[in-house]
Amino acid sequence: QIKLEAFNYLDAAKFVPEYSNEDKAICYGITGGVAKYLSLIDPRKSIDENIIRLFFRTDGYLYDETRNLLTQEFSDIAVVNNIVEQIASGENTLNTIAGKIGEKEPTVLYSLEKLINVGLVEKKKCITEEKNKKKTQYVLKDYMFKFWYEFIPKATSVIEMGQGEIYYEKAVKPVLHSFMGSVFEEMCRYYILMKGITGEYGCFITSVGTWWGVENVADKNGDIRAQSADIDVVALSDIDKMAVIGECKFKNEKIDKGIYDTLIRRGKLITAKYKISKYIFFSLSGYTDWFETLSGEDVLLLTLDSLYE
């Protein structure tokens, strides 16, 4: 059984106490908080040096780790490998995964259930509709696997030539923030649950997750059209029938009014069941000056540093 139990992002940070908060978060993202992988990080070396040393060299411990773990666990390794690759690239429903890899749905479902049992994949449900089977997505639970599948297969030949460092600098480092997007969302959900249990947001938060669905918006011509919509963080208080919703951006650009407007608009899609007590924004790079014009108690502007305070 693989089942690699993971630390939360705060406990994972204790392995690299001298790192900046951004590098602590990235360290959590590439190891998934798994103690075994965290212990491989040399805190005297930079996060970039550690990533190159562990993933982008043929003798790197994590270069072969995913292959080894899957080979030990699964006989139908080709199918499993294809499934994990599809999930890592963003395909997350049974029929799209089956279609992409050319396998029948029952075959894919069998492998997915095994991947869930060993703790590599999890079923994500829309938090306000947990009983709706159609609203189920499959996501990689293990971030180290997610990182590996996102970057290593494409780089194998370059790494085998001994040029993994160049590949990392040119093809991975520039998109590391994009990879960290879903990791940061999970960190923010943990943070809100941790604070919300104590009643910090004016209600007693008992569950946290994500929401997705459809919204109707007007296009440039004023015509109303349906588009898919999601909310990164939705924390619910079923006792108070209240919700806290949030948007997370792990980017080198500030959050602007457009992102604020989108969250306020999408919040209305869940207000039939819950009254929203707080809108919380999480930004790696802060906020534009427009936010200084905001007043009111119901909007909280947080940064990555807030998560580590």
Regions from the PLM with identified roles:
Residues 136-309:
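A cross-kingdom feature that marks ATP-driven nucleic-acid transaction machinery
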Residues 116-127:
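A short, conserved structural fragment
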Residues 13, 28, 98-99:
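The alpha-helix within a helix-turn-helix
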Residues 101-118:
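Short amphipathic alpha-helical interaction segments
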